[in-house]
Amino acid sequence: MPKIKTRRCAAKRFSVTGSGKFKRRRKNMRHILTKKASKRKMQLGQPALVDKTNEKAVKRMLPYA
């Protein structure tokens, strides 16, 4: 049985936590930040977990994670 390739785009976007969940970055923090409140920017800077509905797809993209 050949090895399964990892989707490199997914490997760069997601990391696995100790409990096996996937961590991701939030959107809306690249540019046009002047109109966003400081509170919002601080909250967007915090990492988030991948939703349960998308976890199966991410797991398929990262077979060895």
Swiss-Prot record:
<comment type="similarity">
    <text>Belongs to the bacterial ribosomal protein bL35 family.</text>
</comment>
<dbReference type="InterPro" id="IPR001706">
    <property type="entry name" value="Ribosomal_bL35"/>
</dbReference>
<dbReference type="GO" id="GO:0003735">
    <property type="term" value="F:structural constituent of ribosome"/>
</dbReference>
<keyword id="KW-0689">Ribosomal protein</keyword>
<dbReference type="GO" id="GO:0006412">
    <property type="term" value="P:translation"/>
</dbReference>
<dbReference type="Pfam" id="PF01632">
    <property type="entry name" value="Ribosomal_L35p"/>
</dbReference>
<protein>
    <recommendedName>
        <fullName>Large ribosomal subunit protein bL35</fullName>
    </recommendedName>
</protein>
<dbReference type="GO" id="GO:0022625">
    <property type="term" value="C:cytosolic large ribosomal subunit"/>
</dbReference>
<dbReference type="InterPro" id="IPR037229">
    <property type="entry name" value="Ribosomal_bL35_sf"/>
</dbReference>
<keyword id="KW-0687">Ribonucleoprotein</keyword>
<dbReference type="InterPro" id="IPR021137">
    <property type="entry name" value="Ribosomal_bL35-like"/>
</dbReference>
